């Protein structure tokens, strides 16, 4: 890792989210919260942990990059201690690696993967860690999971490099501010129906709901601070709307946009409350070689974007000699903004995976 790049980012406030199983979180918290208190004090990072009635929980780390890296190193060391303890009386021939799951905005995954997978290959080779970026967004969010596995030093170094790529991506972003719909796990009692119709517990699904800080209120940002995210109040509104739906969350194609019926009065009322102005129209052009990524198989992707944003989206027929297709988005300013974000997230994701 380039030291100069690292030092230049030490004063940047960074927010990184981890997805962990309840048992792992319990170890990080420690008896009477002693372990997480020590990590907070020694690293200087702020640490939020989502409510405990879910099989999986979100740990949110916020602070200067050097504080984040210190907190990560301490968390990884704690996980390594747990592995060593579990191996004391074990007859297993090999010990499992330390494994972390980061939760990052889908718009940044393309940069992490790189053209033809070159960037993620570089990170793997330079750190020695195994790194896998999930192909699908986490349910009801615009985030994806990144799984990192290896020895503690490799995992720590890998996290640093991923953070640097995220910082670089933001600094080069022409838009500067993008909206992220954060993933939040659901309690185990709530079933979801996934792609293919399988029924399972929602340890990997969830509508947004409030998170609880062990020391204070929930954070307003779920990725790098400075990005525009849906506020906790709006998340609460979305949660209320989602719970009023009578159907289960049907995940079409596993993209994670489904779960809210945009035709319901509750959802229409929600978007109206965000922006009561008259409807407007926005047009954009998408290259012909990428339009299929937006439409999806049998229109699954575009329908999910319509449902999640509440906007009307029309894709013009191909025009001979044109290199792109015109897309017309109609709705309130809020719904148009969200539709644009979801389209950009899909494009960024597919470009990173080499969509042609």
Swiss-Prot record:
The modification N-acetylmethionine is found at residue 1. There is a cross-link at residue 115 (Glycyl lysine isopeptide (Lys-Gly) (interchain with G-Cter in SUMO2)). Abundantly expressed in skeletal muscle, thymus and peripheral blood leukocytes while a lower expression is observed in prostate, spleen, testis, ovary, small intestine, heart, liver, adrenal and thyroid glands. GO terms for biological process: positive regulation of transcription by RNA polymerase II; viral RNA genome replication. Disulfide bonds: none annotated. It is found in: Nucleus; Cytoplasm. GO terms for molecular function: cadherin binding; DNA-binding transcription factor activity, RNA polymerase II-specific; mRNA binding; RNA binding; sequence-specific single stranded DNA binding; single-stranded DNA binding. The keyword RNA-binding applies. Pfam families: KH_1. GO terms for cellular component: cytoplasm; cytoplasmic ribonucleoprotein granule; cytosol; extracellular exosome; membrane; nuclear speck; nucleoplasm; nucleus. The modification Phosphoserine is found at residues 173, 189-190, 246, 264, 273. Phosphorylated; lowers poly(rC)-binding activity. Its main location: nucleus. SUPFAM superfamilies: Eukaryotic type KH-domain (KH-domain type I). Residues 13-75, 97-162, 279-343 form the KH domain. It comes from the Eukaryota. Keywords: Acetylation, Cytoplasm, DNA-binding, Isopeptide bond, Nucleus, Phosphoprotein, Repeat, Ribonucleoprotein, RNA-binding, Ubl conjugation, Viral RNA replication. Single-stranded nucleic acid binding protein that binds preferentially to oligo dC. Together with PCBP2, required for erythropoiesis, possibly by regulating mRNA splicing. (Microbial infection) In case of infection by poliovirus, plays a role in initiation of viral RNA replication in concert with the viral protein 3CD. This is Poly(rC)-binding protein 1.
